[in-house]
Design a protein with these regions (language model features):
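Alpha-helix N-capping/helix-start residues
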Residues: 18, 24, 56, 148, ...
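Catalytic alpha/beta core domains of metabolic enzymes, predominantly
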Residues: 128, 141-248
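Short, amphipathic alpha-helical "lid/cap" segments that border enzyme active or binding sites
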Residues: 24, 28-31, 148, 282-289
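Active-site beta->alpha loop and helix N-cap motifs at the rims of alpha/beta catalytic domains
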Residues: 2-10, 14-143, 153
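Glycine-rich phosphate-binding "P-loop"
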Residues: 137-138, 160-161, 271-272
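C-terminal alpha-helical cap/extension of soluble enzyme domains
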Residues: 4-15, 37-39, 48, 207-292
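A general structural signal for well-ordered alpha-helical segments in protein cores
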Residues: 27, 59, 63, 88, ...
Length: 292
């Protein structure tokens, strides 16, 4: 069940022109590059897609564009989350979900709910959503951690929640989830640098930032892990580790956008309050790419 997500998914960027408008030509080029290089699936309008700086009409335009272009060649997961539970449900219900297979919903940020509040938040969303939900734990951004106990409660009690994107960086927590979860509940790495150890511990795949630039390599890493070929996976892991670390030296997605411009895949433009990486980081990323 949901075996398509036992692979490398890409957390797709949103390319912009210098004037801040959406660069659909670059988005098309990037999507075709991903498909050609065997990416498993797309995650649209997540953190890496700068969804927080897109208005409703822009989000609709991106969804429609991606769904039409992908044309069922790969699964598409849509990011819809927030710290107003009712508004998240309203957004899900008002969005045309044709061509979308699942919803990735980040934990509520800023208002810092209790673990009970987090559970109730996802229960309300799961009961209202016509599509399966993947929860997203990224405490470095949200200010709240979805504990292993809460994740397992969600996994056991909310049947419309099919997995978690785990980006806490907390391997003991991830191990506890993997060791105690229901069989079909997916544990997906949300941290490129920890993908190999997460897979070795029993994880199911990754939603990756670096895959925007290196989809073929990261897809191979995941498939090697799934086949138990960890020596081969380790070779790719260490080959990419320096560039992975470099693109996260400054707030993402600034680093990956710098890399994509160097690779001539997309322009290095972000929307305020995000800005491009500094010269030192950009030079390092450029040097590492040249050495790959």
């Amino acid at each position: 069940m949901y075996t398509a997500y036992k692979s490398a998914g890409v957390a797709l960027i949103t390319p912009f022109h210098k004037d801040g408008s959406i660069d659909f030509k670059s988005l098309e080029r990037l999507i075709e590059y991903q498909i050609t290089n065997n990416i498993g699936y797309f995650v649209v309008l997540g953190t890496t897609g700068e969804s927080a700086t897109l208005n409703k009409d822009e989000k609709v335009a991106i969804i429609d564009f991606v769904v039409e272009l992908v044309n069922k060649r790969k699964p598409i997961i849509l990011g819809i989350g927030g710290n107003n539970t009712q508004e998240v449900v309203n957004c899900i219900n008002s969005t045309n979900l044709d061509g979308i297979e699942a919803i990735l919903s980040v934990a509520p940020s800023y208002n810092k709910p209790s673990q009970s509040g987090i559970f109730q938040h996802y229960k309300y969303i799961a009961n209202a959503s016509p599509l399966p939900i993947i929860i997203y734990n990224v405490p470095s951004r949200t200010g709240v951690n979805i504990s292993a106990e809460t994740t397992l409660k969600i996994a056991n009690e909310l049947k419309n929640v099919i997995g978690i994107k785990e980006a806490s960086g907390n391997l003991p927590q991830i191990m506890h989830i993997i060791n105690n979860k229901p069989k079909n509940f997916l544990v997906i790495s949300g941290d490129d640098a920890l993908t190999l150890p997460t897979m070795a511990l029993g994880g199911d795949g990754v939603i990756s930032v670096i895959a925007n630039a290196y989809p073929k390599e990261f897809s191979k890493l995941i498939h090697f892990c799934l086949d138990g070929k960890y020596d081969e996976a380790k070779t790719i892991h260490y080959k990419l580790l320096d560039i992975i670390n470099a693109i996260f030296l400054e707030v993402s997605p600034a680093g990956i956008k710098a890399a994509l411009e160097i690779l001539k895949l997309a322009p290095n433009n972000l929307r305020l309050p995000l800005v491009p990486v500094g010269k030192t980081t950009n030079s390092l990323i450029s040097k590492l790419i040249q050495n790959l």
